Amino acid sequence: MGKETHNRSNLESEDKGLNMLLEEDARLIIPTLAQKKSLLSILDYPNIYTRSFDLVRLNVDSFESVKSRKDFVLIEVKVTSKKLVDFPIGFFFGLTKNEESLLQGLEGDFLLCLISIHPESRKSIYLDYDALTVRIKNKRIQYQINL
């Protein structure tokens, strides 16, 4: 599979996973860039983190009602199309340093959501930093470098 085809496949899987979550929970929204910046400002985090989360779970009726950190939770989504018999065991994903920083630093205000979109193991789980770290089997650091 070529790189472009692989990237397209990953984006399609992510879209399926996001749609699955949005259908299951009416409190979830896909925030705009401006909304992401507004939420990060409330959390006193810089805008470099705008690409570190995919969804927001509102604890209020609408985005316009968000006034403080208790009004929302940031969510980073990781999707697999692999059949996982004992979900989430066997789930493999990448996590950026920024995503890990938010997960660790915003305990309770940032969650990682793992989703299997395989028809025979269609499930999701939300994890905070502690719940993730106790499940990690292997972890390695990888640098991505552009020249």
Positions of PLM-derived features:
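Residues immediately flanking
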Residues: 77-79, 97, 117
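Alpha-helix capping/termination and helix-coil
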Residues: 25, 59-63, 82
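Conserved catalytic cores of phosphodiester-cleaving nucleases, focusing on short active-site segments
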Residues: 55-57, 71-83
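Active-site metal-binding core of divalent-cation-utilizing nuclease and nuclease-like domains
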Residues: 35-69
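Mg2+/Mn2+-dependent nuclease catalytic core
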Residues: 81-105
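Acidic-basic catalytic patches of nuclease active cores, encompassing PD-(D/E)XK
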Residues: 1-44
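Residues that flank catalytic or metal-binding motifs in active/ligand-binding sites
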Residues: 51, 71-73, 108
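Domain-level recognition of nuclease-like catalytic cores that cleave nucleotide substrates
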Residues: 104-147
